[in-house]
Every structure is written in structure tokens, then in C-alpha cells.
């Protein structure tokens, strides 16, 4: 049976209630979230063995966080305690023409201070078959980037399949290196690349010239982009690219494509109106894709599962995708009516 390990930072998520602006009312909703943890939760939720590695301060907030992850069935036995603090991000959900806003407070977090050798990846990967990482943790600090590179090199050496969601975050790359410099090296060790057009441009230096703000996307250009990425990274086996047509903060069209050096496939498109929470939508796609590639015969089926999983996440508040395996399969199979299930 496949076991997936993810590695990265989990944060305290502080969100303004509903669609309010920051401190429009004197309260913030506190939950936890982080790209790699979100993927682990999705996989555990679908019945796969999933483990999560991070570095946290030894305090009550960390213990509450780990209790929540255990509650989803995620193995956190390889979490390491270190110096520093628990990272935070603040979220204000957008509506219509007002975009969502994220403010990071991650300086001097435990994972930002962590360095190569602080995590026993050999032990953590002992019974695993798949390792997943993102481009977020390498953006936090230079030592976190070095630790991330150590992780992918170790996973590759031990024979694990390695996936990476490039996840470019412009507000995080502050320590003197550009994303392209760091991620171009890390991606050399990746088997399955997950990205959007901005990730390919900012993290890998590969242009697409697609205007996502127009609300309409040309899939032919994405096929060219996918081929260009795999041409640059000959050891990568496939790339999945998410296609988000943003009509407004509340209304998106959502689909994706996958290329495996032989075939290029574009998924069905979902029109998502009245978005509840799009944060974690990309992580839900990544988790769905990893599940699909481990449980379906074709890449096309895996992609359809991933897109359906992510579509459902847009209807669920919080970072974690709480959609069940049966719900994802039902939507994947064409039941998107939203009718009451009795």
C-alpha cells in the first residue's frame, strides 16, 4: 500500500469572520493550515496512509495543531521540535470584485530557523513510497530552502516518487535569492510537477504569455507550456497545470491539464459560483492528483479526480478539504447538482 509523506510549514490561520474586512469586528477565527499539511489531510481523508513532517516550537499551540492533524488520521510521529515560533497568516476573504488578502507573519518561525540535518528524513521515509513538497517552504528562509533540497535529494535516493507543487508566493521570497534560482535546482529531483502559469514563469523562468485576468484560457498554450517544462527537466515524468479562469473573487471556472510526455489531457471545467473559501484549493488539487495517480489506471482519471476534489474544496471553509472520497467520486462521475442526499 502506498504511503505519502509531506514536508513543510503549518501555520496558525487567523481569519476575519465571513466576508468582513480585517477587524471590522473585534474577532478573528483561529484554525490551522499550510500547503503540505493540507495535502496530507486530503490523502488521509481518502483512506491513504499519510505522514506529515515539520519543525515546530514545543508549546501548547503546536500540541493543539498536532492533535488536530492526528484527528484526520495523519501520522505526525516524525515532527521535530526546534527553536523559534509558530508561524501565522492572516486571511481576509474577498467577494465579487474585492480580492482576498493574505498577510504573513512567519519570520523566525521554527521551520524558518531549521537547517539541514535537523530532520531525520531517512527515518521518516523508511516505509514511504511518495514524497510531496511545495515551493512555499523554500521561500521562507535560505536554511529552509537548503533543508527542502536535502529532503528531495534524500527521497530520490531512497527511491520515492517525488512531487512538487511549485506554489510561487511573491511576498515570501525576501532573503536575497529569487525563486528561479532555488526552485530550478530543487525541481531537478521531481517526478511529478504541479503548477500554474505564474509558477512556471516565476519559479522556473518559463514564459506562457497567458492573460489569466481575461477570464478565458487557451489550452493549446498550456500544452506548449507543459512540453517546455518537461523539456527543461528531462527526469520529470509528468506535469499537471491548474487552469483557473477568474471572473471575480466569488466566481471562478476551474479545470486542469496533464502531460506525461506521450499524451496531453484537459479535464472537464467546473463553473464555481459563490465561492466559500478558495484557500487550500490548489492543495486539494495536489492531494487529489496524488491519490488519483496511486489509485487509477490512467492519468486522465487521476486528473478528473483531482479537479473534482478541488472544486468541492471551494465550498468548504478552512484550509483542509473535508470532502469525502465518495463525494469526490460522485462529482467526478457527473453528479454536480448539489441536491440534498437523503
Annotate each language-model stretch with its function.
Residues 49-136, 328-342:
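Conserved N-terminal subdomain of the carbohydrate kinase-like
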Residues 172-262:
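Conserved phosphate/ATP/ADP-binding segment of small-molecule kinases
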Residues 1-21:
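Positively charged, low-complexity intrinsically disordered leader regions
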Residues 21-39:
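Short catalytic helix/loop segments, enriched in acidic residues and glycine
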Residues 31, 38-49, 292-295:
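Alpha-helix C-terminal capping segments
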Residues 156-161, 233-237:
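A short helix->loop->beta-strand "cap" motif at the edges of active sites that frequently abuts
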Residues 265-335:
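Conserved post-catalytic alpha-helical subdomain immediately downstream of the catalytic base
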Amino acid at each position: 500500500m502506498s504511503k505519502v509523506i509531506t514536508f513543510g510549514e503549518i501555520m496558525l490561520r487567523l481569519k476575519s469572520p465571513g466576508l468582513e474586512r480585517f477587524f471590522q469586528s473585534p474577532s478573528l477565527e483561529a484554525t490551522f493550515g499550510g500547503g503540505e499539511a493540507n495535502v496530507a489531510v486530503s490523502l488521509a481523508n481518502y483512506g491513504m496512509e499519510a505522514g506529515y513532517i515539520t519543525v515546530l516550537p514545543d508549546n501548547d499551540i503546536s500540541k493543539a495543531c498536532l492533535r488536530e492533524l492526528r484527528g484526520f488520521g495523519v501520522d505526525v510521529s516524525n515532527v521535530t521540535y526546534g527553536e523559534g515560533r509558530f508561524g501565522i497568516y492572516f486571511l481576509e476573504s474577498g467577494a465579487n470584485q474585492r480580492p482576498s488578502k493574505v498577510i504573513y507573519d512567519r519570520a523566525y518561525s521554527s521551520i524558518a530557523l531549521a537547517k539541514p540535518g535537523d530532520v531525520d528524513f531517512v527515518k521518516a521515509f523508511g516505509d514511504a513510497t511518495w514524497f510531496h513538497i511545495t515551493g512555499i517552504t523554500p521561500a521562507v528562509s535560505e536554511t529552509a530552502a537548503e533543508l527542502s533540497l536535502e529532503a528531495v535529494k534524500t527521497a530520490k535516493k531512497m527511491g520515492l516518487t517525488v512531487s512538487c507543487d511549485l506554489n510561487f508566493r511573491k511576498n515570501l521570497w525576501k532573503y536575497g535569492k529569487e525563486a528561479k534560482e532555488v526552485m530550478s535546482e530543487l525541481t531537478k529531483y521531481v517526478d511529478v510537477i504541479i503548477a500554474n502559469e505564474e509558477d512556471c514563469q516565476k519559479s522556473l523562468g518559463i514564459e506562457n504569455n497567458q492573460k489569466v485576468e481575461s477570464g478565458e484560457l487557451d489550452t493549446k498554450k498550456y500544452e506548449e507550456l507543459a512540453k517546455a517544462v518537461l523539456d527543461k527537466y528531462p527526469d520529470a515524468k509528468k506535469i499537471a497545470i491548474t487552469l483557473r479562469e477568474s471572473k471575480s473573487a466569488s466566481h471562478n471556472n476551474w479545470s486542469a491539464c496533464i502531460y506525461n510526455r506521450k499524451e496531453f489531457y484537459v479535464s472537464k471545467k467546473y463553473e464555481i459560483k459563490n465561492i466559500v473559501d478558495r484557500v487550500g484549493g490548489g492543495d486539494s488539487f495536489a492531494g487529489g492528483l496524488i491519490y488519483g495517480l496511486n489509485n487509477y489506471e490512467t492519468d486522465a482519471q487521476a486528473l478528473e479526480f483531482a479537479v473534482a476534489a478541488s472544486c468541492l474544496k471551494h465550498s468548504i471553509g478552512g484550509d483542509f478539504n473535508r470532502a469525502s472520497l465518495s463525494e469526490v467520486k460522485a462529482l467526478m462521475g457527473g453528479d454536480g447538482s448539489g441536491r440534498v442526499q437523503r
